[in-house]
Amino acid sequence: TGSDGKTTTTTLISEMLKAEGKTVWLGGNIGTPLLPLTRQMKETDLAVVELSSFQLMDMKRSPQRAVVTNLAPNHLDIHKDMQEYVDAKKNIFRYQDGSGLLVLNADNDITAAFRGNGTTRFFSRKGMAYVCIEDGVICRNGKPILPTKDILIPGVHNIENYMAAITVVEGLVS
């Protein structure tokens, strides 16, 4: 989830997992409702789901792995205030247990203050974090992963989307 970058990040995660040979179900706010497809899913399959604040408002369960790309004032015509919007977004990790993974943008003032119940990993374009940029290369835990010049989708924000995806797929892809 996030204010911006949800669809791109969800798609990147899905493609990274598929490239590793995983069976991936992509859906949610991205256009495909997954609920009707759950009977076709196998226990070893992975679901990558884009969730909006509206979908998260009443959620009482959280996924094992969650990403919050960034948060900024959004949908305030629907939410009574910014705090209600932020609280809805927090539901993506609020119910994780100690084995959960939460991925957050350290460069966003709101998400930088969040902490999960399990492991919390940060990505940052501007400073040191678990996933950061060193000499033009996205690095995860100090190891080079991807030169930023190889990212063909234009825009600095898409570097952040890649960083979020690279962080959350750790342990699932080589």
Predicted regions and their residues:
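Phosphate-binding loop of NTP-binding sites
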Residues: 1-106, 110-119
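Adenine nucleotide phosphate-binding catalytic loops in nucleotide-utilizing enzymes
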Residues: 80-83, 90, 119-174
